[in-house]
């Protein structure tokens, strides 16, 4: 809880809701006749509407990327370390938009929303949405806000996939793309992890084939287990070792299945805390969006061919201990962009935090991000002059 | 701009694809992108240099050249450059092979250890030369291979590498007739334009 709002915070922010009544055709063949997107904005849009940055969130992110909703909030938004006045994504220079993606559970239309056609909650019947669908819906939000071209679109992990899709689908609608700790498609191992996460949810007897709210139930065990698994893969072996080692709960072994090691307690806590703020159907949808993303499939697996459509400048960032989206995966994108002759810079940041590093204010990471975006901002001001 | 870079600039055709290995703060690449409209990329591992490149808008990739260049396809660049860096890599001979695999042509510049002052320093003082241009001690120098103008020429001959042209300049990076006539003795920086 902040006693006072820090000087480099965007302060108290209020989410807004955009209503869309033009049907959105989805990759799966279904369409959404109407839907809502919840979003927040930080900073001021300039007169030519050229200084907007779109933030794309990852698996469990939402529209609350920076600042506080109330003075009683225990924590600021999920990327507050990077977004704010004077920060890497400088709200003195940019108008920053963060939204909750379709299928989410934080205010945008998703499985917990009411299906207007039935008057019932969507739950299991909510169609599977893809990265492509998200980007389409984000473009409509941009239209609504009067933004033709983004100065930059920024995202980490699954968010980075959305940025990549933007660069291919709407090449003239962004000047620069920042893709952090991401990949051009999931590896087999990553799909496998997602399947274990989904199975742990689906096999929870409280899941009721996805219609758990109707059954006054919450699949906390399954969702918690999925989050525990995810959490292990977001951290590096070293980071976990440094944090917990073999620290014990008791002075000696208890020889039972209670908590012996502190890491067990930590994981259980993380799993349980997650079930209080996240919806299991949304989690399943997000993992499917990850699995399906593969823009190179449009060009017979040739990533550089599909990226030849892009026109923006790219910055790619990876982290040395990230094994869920390893530096090699970012380098696949880098190499394809070089092959296609696109403007790209790439930084491989030394970090101990594993995949989670993309959420940490690692000094060199923030410097690289800030340097790249400062140039984007400077170019905007020279263009206006 | 350093005059060895000016010489390179004269040799580079406009609108080509250029890869600059160990590009440092991107001085040459910046110039080539602005004035020759090349599609250029730099490789670098120095954090400050990388940042300067990003600041200037020079496409730069953080990649350790000693760990290989397999990510670049055969003949995928018109020109591969390396200025004042070849002496810093583990296997300069294999690196030249790689450069010629990736690039149709290469331009390499290096400090000529056969310069008379280096020879005199070693001959009279009996100690490894330390100069303004190579200001390191033997134990902390990043320059782990020292070679001369002639050594490089010989390597090219052994590998059947064509020397398209060369230049040799002194400490002030000026071109004089005596340097041109005896480059191994008088040049401090050698510049080679090579191909297969």
From Swiss-Prot, chain A:
Could you state one GO biological process linked to this protein? homoserine metabolic process
SUPFAM superfamilies per record: alpha/beta-Hydrolases
Instruction: Give the positions of the site Important for acyl-CoA specificity.
Output: 324
Q: Domain of life here?
A: Bacteria
Tell me which residues make up the AB hydrolase-1 domain.
51-359
Coiled coil spans: none
Matching entries from Gene3D superfamilies are given as: 1.10.1740.110, alpha/beta hydrolase
Keyword Electron transport listed? The answer is no
Reaction catalysed by this enzyme: L-homoserine + succinyl-CoA = O-succinyl-L-homoserine + CoA
Extract the GO molecular function terms from the UniProt entry. homoserine O-acetyltransferase activity; homoserine O-succinyltransferase activity
List locations, semicolon-separated.
Cytoplasm
Task: List the Pfam families hit by this protein, alphabetically.
Answer: Abhydrolase_1
The record describes its quaternary structure and partners as:
Homodimer.
This chain belongs to which protein, by name?
Homoserine O-succinyltransferase
The species is Marinomonas sp. (strain MWYL1)
Q: Which lineage do the record's taxonomy fields give for this organism?
A: Bacteria, Pseudomonadati, Pseudomonadota, Gammaproteobacteria, Oceanospirillales
């Amino acid at each position: 809880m902040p006693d006072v709002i820090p000087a480099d915070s965007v302060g108290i922010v209020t989410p807004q809701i955009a209503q869309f009544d033009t049907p959105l055709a989805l990759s799966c063949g279904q369409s959404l006749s109407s839907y809502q997107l919840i979003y927040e904005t930080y900073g001021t849009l300039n007169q030519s509407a050229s200084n907007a940055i779109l933030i794309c969130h990852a698996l469990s992110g939402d529209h609350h990327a920076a600042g506080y909703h109330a003075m009683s909030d225990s924590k600021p938004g999920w990327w507050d370390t990077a977004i704010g006045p004077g920060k890497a994504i400088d709200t003195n220079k940019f108008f920053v938009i963060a939204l909750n993606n379709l299928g989410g559970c934080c205010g945008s239309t998703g499985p917990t929303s009411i299906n207007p056609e039935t008057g019932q909650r969507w739950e299991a019947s909510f169609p599977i949405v893809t990265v492509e669908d998200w980007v389409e819906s984000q473009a409509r939000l941009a239209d609504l806000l009067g933004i033709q071209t983004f100065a930059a679109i920024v995202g980490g992990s699954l968010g980075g996939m959305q940025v990549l899709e933007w660069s291919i689908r709407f090449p003239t609608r962004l000047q620069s793309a920042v893709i952090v700790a991401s990949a051009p498609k999931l590896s087999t191992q990553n799909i496998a992890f997602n399947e274990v996460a989904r199975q742990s949810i689906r096999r929870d007897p409280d899941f009721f084939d996805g219609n758990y709210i109707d059954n006054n139930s919450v699949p906390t065990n399954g969702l918690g287990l999925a989050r525990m698994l995810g959490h292990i893969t977001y951290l590096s072996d070293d980071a976990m070792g440094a944090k917990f080692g073999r620290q014990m709960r008791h002075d000696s072994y208890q020889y039972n299945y209670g908590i012996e090691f502190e890491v067990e307690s930590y994981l259980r806590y993380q799993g349980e805390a997650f079930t209080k703020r996240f919806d299991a159907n949304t989690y399943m949808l997000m993992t499917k969006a990850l699995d399906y993303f593969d823009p190179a499939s449009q060009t017979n697996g040739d990533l550089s061919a599909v990226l030849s459509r892009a026109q923006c400048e790219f910055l790619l960032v990876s982290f040395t201990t990230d094994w869920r989206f390893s530096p090699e995966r970012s380098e696949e994108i880098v190499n394809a962009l070089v092959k296609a002759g696109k403007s790209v810079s790439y930084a491989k940041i030394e970090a101990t935090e594993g995949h989670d590093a993309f959420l940490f204010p690692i000094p060199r990471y923030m410097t690289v991000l800030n340097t790249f975006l400062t140039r984007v901002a400077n170019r905007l001001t020279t263009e206006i002059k | 701009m350093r005059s060895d870079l000016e010489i390179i600039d004269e040799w580079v055709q406009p609108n080509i694809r250029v890869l600059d290995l160990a590009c440092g703060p991107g001085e040459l690449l910046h110039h080539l992108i602005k004035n020759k409209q090349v599609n250029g990329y730099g490789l670098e591992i120095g954090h400050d240099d990388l940042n300067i490149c990003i600041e200037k808008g020079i496409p730069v990739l953080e990649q350790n050249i000693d760990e290989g260049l397999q990510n670049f396809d055969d003949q995928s660049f018109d020109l591969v450059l390396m200025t004042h860096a070849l002496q810093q890599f583990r296997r300069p001979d294999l690196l030249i092979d790689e450069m010629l695999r990736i690039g149709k042509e290469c331009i390499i510049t290096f400090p000529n250890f056969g310069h008379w002052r280096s020879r005199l320093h070693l001959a009279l003082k009996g100690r490894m030369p330390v100069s303004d241009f190579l200001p390191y001690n033997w134990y902390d120098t990043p320059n782990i291979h020292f070679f001369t103008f002639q050594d490089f020429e010989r390597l090219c001959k052994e590998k059947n590498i064509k020397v398209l042209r060369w230049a040799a300049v002194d400490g002030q990076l000026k071109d004089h007739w005596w340097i041109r006539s005896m480059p191994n003795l008088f040049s401090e920086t050698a510049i080679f334009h090579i191909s297969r």
